[in-house]
A protein has these predicted regions:
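Catalytic-loop of the protein kinase fold
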Residues: 166-182
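Regulatory alphaC helix of protein kinase catalytic domains
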Residues: 95, 99-100
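Activation segment signature within eukaryotic-like protein kinase domains
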Residues: 154-155
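A conserved loop-to-beta-strand element in the N-lobe of protein kinase catalytic cores
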Residues: 119-127, 135-136
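Short beta-strand micro-motifs within the conserved protein kinase catalytic domain, predominantly
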Residues: 112-120
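Protein kinase glycine-rich loop
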Residues: 53-64
């Protein structure tokens, strides 16, 4: 269950147009008390070089602004500082985790970490993607759907990013379209927001604090008596469940459990084993991935490396063909045009048919 801690020391928009390095201690006097933070000095940026512009997003744990770091346009996430010493300690711990995890994983489908500062505000600086969130993009597109090869391409981007996190022992716990950002040309997707991420170990028991119900795995909240702060066992397969919901959404462009409130969706998924309906026009291969991701038993869900392999196979068959070259010609490495003979074209056609037949047998 996510915990919203509001920054009571500042009014809406107060950070906009400000330089972080200026004196901006909070109303409760705790903003500068950061001696317990243990972040490598090489990860810190000079707050005097940060300038906060307009707000571009907001989550449970902070606000995100467009800004500038030196001469570079960046995204600046200002974390809530809490209104009590206890809140401050908890939020500092989350800040440390997020910075350390973002700094150690690098992938083309993960938002690039630039740096952080801890005084006078807890701030994380990342690359700024000029596109929009996947959530907003899908909403703007409705009632139309994504083209199939685009939807699968986005899903592959997400699965590759998650595979990288899991390979580094990190559970994201908040995988949803709001935390997925499009590049400027809308060609690919990058995963953002490590605010709820956790490092995974075999013996660790993690808190029930989690992301948004509609995308959450049932094992995160299925114990009725579980109170905030209590411990509960789960593993990285909670991200696989969330991915299954996101993949369904990419293919249908519908809100999961759209007829239900958040709590109704949680109850239906956890106690009635309900899942969003899979339309008939979704291929059996994609339906299989979705259903295997959100199966009740976490141990039966696939790994992201398996999901990546399956999606790659499907994408190969649905990707749009490149425009034909004039007169069945192909460009050679030295830039000259070489024409394919009729027998050569027939040979390539035969190879494509052979591959399709082999794949069909494997699926049976």
């Amino acid at each position: 269950m996510s915990c919203t801690v509001k920054n009571k020391g500042r009014e809406e928009g107060e950070y906009e147009g400000s330089v972080i390095g200026q004196n901006s201690s909070s109303q409760n006097g705790l903003i500068a008390s950061s001696s317990d933070l243990s972040i490598d000095e090489s990860l810190l940026v000079d707050p005097k070089m940060l300038f906060i512009g307009s707000k571009i997003g907001e989550g449970a744990h902070g606000k995100v602004y467009e800004g500038r770091y030196g001469d570079r346009i960046v995204a600046i996430k200002v974390l809530h500082c809490g209104s009590t010493p206890e809140e401050r300690i908890a939020l500092e711990s989350r800040f440390i985790r997020e910075v350390n995890m973002m700094s150690r994983v690098k992938h083309e489908n993960l938002v690039k970490f630039i740096g952080a500062c801890k005084d006078p505000l807890m701030v994380i600086v990342t690359e700024l993607l000029p596109g929009m969130s996947l959530r907003r993009y899908l909403v703007n597109l409705r009632p139309k759907q994504l083209e199939l090869h685009v939807a699968i391409g986005y899903a592959l981007d997400i699965a590759q990013a998650m595979d990288c996190l899991h390979a580094n022992g990190i559970i994201h716990r908040d995988l949803k379209p709001d935390n997925l950002l499009l590049t400027a040309n809308h060609k690919s997707v990058k995963l953002a927001d490590f605010g709820l991420a956790r490092e995974e170990s075999v013996t660790e028991m993690m808190t029930a604090e989690t992301g948004t119900y509609r995308w959450m795995a049932p094992e995160l909240y299925s114990t009725v008596t579980l109170r905030q702060g209590e411990k509960k066992h789960y593993n990285n397969k909670v991200d696989v469940y969330s991915f299954g919901i996101v993949l369904w959404e990419l293919l249908t462009n519908r809100m999961p459990f759209d007829k239900m409130s958040n709590l109704q969706a949680a109850y239906a998924a956890a106690f009635k084993q309900e899942r969003p309906p899979i339309p008939d026009d979704i291929s059996p291969e994609l339906a299989f991935i979705i259903q295997s991701c959100w199966v009740e038993d976490p141990n039966l869900r696939p790994s992201f490396s398996q999901i990546v392999r399956l999606l790659n196979e499907i994408l190969f068959t649905v990707a749009p063909s490149p425009p034909p070259l004039p007169e069945s010609a192909a460009t050679t490495s030295n830039g000259t045009i070489a024409k394919f003979s009729v027998p050569a074209r027939g040979k390539f056609s035969f190879i494509r048919q052979l591959f399709a037949a082999k794949r069909s047998r494997n699926l049976q």
